[in-house]
Amino acid sequence: GTVSRGLAQVVEAAFSRWGQPNGYILGQEASGAFIVGLRYGDGKLYTKNAGARRVFWEGPSVGFDYGGEGARTMMLVYNLPATSAIYQRFAGIDGSAYFIGGFGMTALGNGNIIVVPIRSGVGLRLGANIGYLKFTPQATWNPF
């Protein structure tokens, strides 16, 4: 009940602000930070016209951010002209407050394309940071 309600409220907030996406990514990720942080994840990009495509993401962050988390992730993708356009960097500001579990939503952008990660995670993390996610067709350890 509470988990479903929390997720529904986060998705509703995204739809009311940005409308209906033309793609979405379902996946999982792990992240950790002690002032400087790293995030790694993988999933599948789904679009109405082009089907599914495997994607990986990684990225650095810096800020007043401490702890670690593992999360199931749904990313709403807006204004994606082609599936290959996802393979670039998307910058944004993120804030997290996890104590055992929680939800989070942020918005990342590059030009007209907006990616809205919605995370449901477990861990212990508190803080705010600025950073980016880099989407790639293959997994890599290099977040830059």
Regions found by a protein language model. Give the residues of each.
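Small-residue-enriched, tightly packed secondary-structure blocks
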Residues: 1-144
